[in-house]
């Protein structure tokens, strides 16, 4: 909600969307808070405590992250929107939504527990969703009884990154204690390098964010498109959609379309917000809130997209190239057949679809697909959503990621 207050803003620094991923209870939210505390000590941002990040009553009651939370901070070189993702397997759909908006990720791994199930699945999902750069932060270093474990853990993490297609030999892997760094900054909010080793380790992580994550190439000249991540009701203001602009740019007063689920809706941009600040224009990569004319809870929902008029349509039938993960990759153990109905993840939406026919690139049609196979498939979703050719998606079933695909053709269903 902080993104929806008032202040004129024009960002002059390079903007990146980064986030924390990793297994449940390994310290992602604490690390997010520690980063803001250290940067606040330098004078670049406002500090955020854990309970201000996991801010919903449900999260406070359960003492765990459930939703993706957005935190703003700046370094000397860059402006960041930080997406703190849930690590529990039950909320993997929210994690996918967060990662789909990131330019790079910080993988948090407990030094005590080492890499766990969601550590590996989050690395896999980051790769499938197009993340090319991951930094690793081995947290809870202070809780280790034997410091000689660290070199072995670091080497293990490098091998895991390589297995999933990341440059593990060169990926930065840093160690520290987010909790002790946060406690030190709460006790003395002024940052002084060399005064506290745990604070210095967070400072080093921040430096690596600036140095290691490449500047993203934004699609500024493409038609405007923003997937809706959340819809928030602001009292005396109305419904505000939040999300990250995928491509193009948008100005206050411009006409847009709301596409997905039902008939396309026409609207106009009333207000643009980025965290605490009002924008006149927002561009690709910006993490914003947008207030549109004439919206209600029926025509303005998570999973829809806001787009330049006449540039995207809703579809529920398409042909896709699909790879089904092997068991060793975390995928299925057994084949599936025509009529299989898993969950498909596109941008910010999770939707059930039916796989109606299968065909090998060489070898013709088949009625059964084995783990490890690459096929073409016709898929019908249970309702239409905004789709385009060459869009990537993730397939999940029963709590496991089982495949990845790319849309080849969009199909109109004949009446």
UniProtKB/Swiss-Prot annotation:
Enzyme class: hydrolase
Compartment(s): Plastid, Chloroplast
Family: Belongs to the TRAFAC class translation factor GTPase superfamily. Classic translation factor GTPase family. EF-Tu/EF-1A subfamily.
HAMAP family on file: EF_Tu_B
Function comment: GTP hydrolase that promotes the GTP-dependent binding of aminoacyl-tRNA to the A-site of ribosomes during protein biosynthesis.
Organism domain of life: Eukaryota
Ranges where the record places region G4: 139-142
One GO MF term: GTPase activity
Any one GO cellular component localisation term in the record: chloroplast
Region (G5): 177-179
Residues bound to GTP: 22-29, 84-88, 139-142
A GO biological-process term: mitochondrial translational elongation
EC number: 3.6.5.3
Gene for this chain: tufA
Major localization listed first in the record, in broad terms: plastid
Keyword terms of this UniProt record: Chloroplast, Elongation factor, GTP-binding, Hydrolase, Magnesium, Metal-binding, Nucleotide-binding, Plastid, Protein biosynthesis
Catalyzed reaction equations: GTP + H2O = GDP + phosphate + H(+)
Record bears the keyword Oxidoreductase: no
Residues covered by region (G2): 63-67
PROSITE patterns membership: G_TR_2
UniProt-recorded name of the protein: Elongation factor Tu, chloroplastic
G3: region residues: 84-87
Domain tr-type G, first and last residues per copy: 13-217
Species of origin: Coleochaete orbicularis (Charophycean green alga)
């Amino acid at each position: 909600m902080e993104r929806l207050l008032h202040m004129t803003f024009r960002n002059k620094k390079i903007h990146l969307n980064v986030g924390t991923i990793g297994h449940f209870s390994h310290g992602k939210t604490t690390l997010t808070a520690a980063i803001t505390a250290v940067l606040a000590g330098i004078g670049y941002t406002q500090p955020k405590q854990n309970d201000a990040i996991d801010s919903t009553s449900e999260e406070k009651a359960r003492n765990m992250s459930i939703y993706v939370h957005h935190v703003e901070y700046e370094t000397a070189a860059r402006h960041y929107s930080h997406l703190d993702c849930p690590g529990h397997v039950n909320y993997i759909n929210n994690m996918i939504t967060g990662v789909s908006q990131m330019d790079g990720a910080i993988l948090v791994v407990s030094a005590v527990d080492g890499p766990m199930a969601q550590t590996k699945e989050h690395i896999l999902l980051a790769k499938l969703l197009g993340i090319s750069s991951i930094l690793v932060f081995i947290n809870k270093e202070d809780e280790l009884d034997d410091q000689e474990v660290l070199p072995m853990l670091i080497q293990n993490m490098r091998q895991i990154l390589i297995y999933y297609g990341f440059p593990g030999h060169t990926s930065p892997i840093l160690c520290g204690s987010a909790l002790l760094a946060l406690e030190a900054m709460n006790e003395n909010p002024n940052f002084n390098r060399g005064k506290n080793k745990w604070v210095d380790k967070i400072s080093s992580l921040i430096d690596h964010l600036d140095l290691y994550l490449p500047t993203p190439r934004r699609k500024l000249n493409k038609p405007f498109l923003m997937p809706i991540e959340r819809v928030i009701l602001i009292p005396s203001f109305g419904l505000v959609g939040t999300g990250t602009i995928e491509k193009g740019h948008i100005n206050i007063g411009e006409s847009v379309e709301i596409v997905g689920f039902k008939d396309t809706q026409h609207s106009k941009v009333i207000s643009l917000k980025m965290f605490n600040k009002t924008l006149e224009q927002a561009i690709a990569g910006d993490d914003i809130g947008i207030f549109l004319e004439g919206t209600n809870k029926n025509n303005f929902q998570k999973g829809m997209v806001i787009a330049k008029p006449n540039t995207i349509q809703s579809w529920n039938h398409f042909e896709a190239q699909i790879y089904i993960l092997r068991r060793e990759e975390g995928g299925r153990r057994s084949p599936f057949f025509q009529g299989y109905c898993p969950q498909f993840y596109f941008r910010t939406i999770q939707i059930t679809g039916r796989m109606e026919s299968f065909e090998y690139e060489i070898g013709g049609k088949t009625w059964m697909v084995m783990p490890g196979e690459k096929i073409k498939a016709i898929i019908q979703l249970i309702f239409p959503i905004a789709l385009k050719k060459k869009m990537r998606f993730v397939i999940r079933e029963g709590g496991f990621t089982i495949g990845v695909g790319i849309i080849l053709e969009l199909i109109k269903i004949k009446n």
